[in-house]
Amino acid sequence: MEKIPLIVIAGLTATGKTDVAVELAQLVNGEIVSADSMCVYKLMDIGTAKPTKEQREAVRHHVIDVVFPDEDYNVAMFQKDATNAILDIYKRGKVPLLVGGTGFYIKSVVDDIEFPEMGDSKQVRKKLFDELNNKGNMYLYELLKEIDKDAANSVHPNNVKRVIRYLEIYFLTGKKPTEFLDKVRRKGSERYNVLPLCFIMEREALWQRIDQRVEKMFDMGLADEVKMLLDMGYSKDLKSMQGLGYKQVIPYVEGKISLQEAKEELKIRTRQFAKRQRIWFKYQGEFVFLDVTGMRFEEVVKKCFELCKSVV
């Protein structure tokens, strides 16, 4: 069976993945499949740093604006949507590019991970968020510790999103999160001929780009976007609204902190996110790391294009 060429552009936030991918897609006659867990949400454009209208007109994008902010979406659903998009792109004689910074989303496609069936998590998640609001994050963390010490030891108590995700797995499957995840089997990249690029950047340069991105987001109307979502009735406790770029801005919209405090909080959280990304990608092993520090945009595109010749 002929393998499908798949160009992966992964890496740290704010390293210019989207801009390079759009240019590269035009050079290789490709289309982009977004691998970003936040870009799947409709109405959430600025805080998710979605490709611009011009970029989406220049190159067709897939797996963007899939669900509304109060609808469920997870890695298994992404894998199905992304795989279907890749097959469709290839059948039409074009080259698929998988682009984004959500590592496990990328891995689910590239490694063709098999996910066990899970039930509807909406009601379970609502109950857990009610517990969070009424009893606090330490209550949930202690609950996780009782259920699965190994899972609890792998996550910080303040990482509420991850704690809740582990508890969801337990209440939906009846299994310890670590046991459940151990049964997620890797089948390997049998269907794809993959070029797995990963953009990295020196810390000081990346911090500067993150600061610039946050300032630009606020200039583009991030606070107005968050206010609009709240005014439309989307709860601040939703998984989507707890995402980076939204959770940090809600207190400002509610009048609890200043604009400058909101900006600083988002900058700090984005840096922390970039650190976690760096660690995750580093330990995957299969990526070709491309340090884009100080490189001009044209140089990055040219380098990627040269590397693409191995699969296209």
From Swiss-Prot:
Its cofactor is Mg(2+). Keywords: ATP-binding, Magnesium, Nucleotide-binding, Transferase, tRNA processing. InterPro entries: Dimethylallyltransferase (IPR039657), IPT (IPR018022), P-loop_NTPase (IPR027417). It catalyses: adenosine(37) in tRNA + dimethylallyl diphosphate = N(6)-dimethylallyladenosine(37) in tRNA + diphosphate. The record marks 102, 125 as: Interaction with substrate tRNA. The keyword Lyase does not apply. GO terms for biological process: tRNA modification. Its EC number is 2.5.1.75. One of its GO terms (molecular function) is tRNA dimethylallyltransferase activity. Monomer. This is tRNA dimethylallyltransferase.
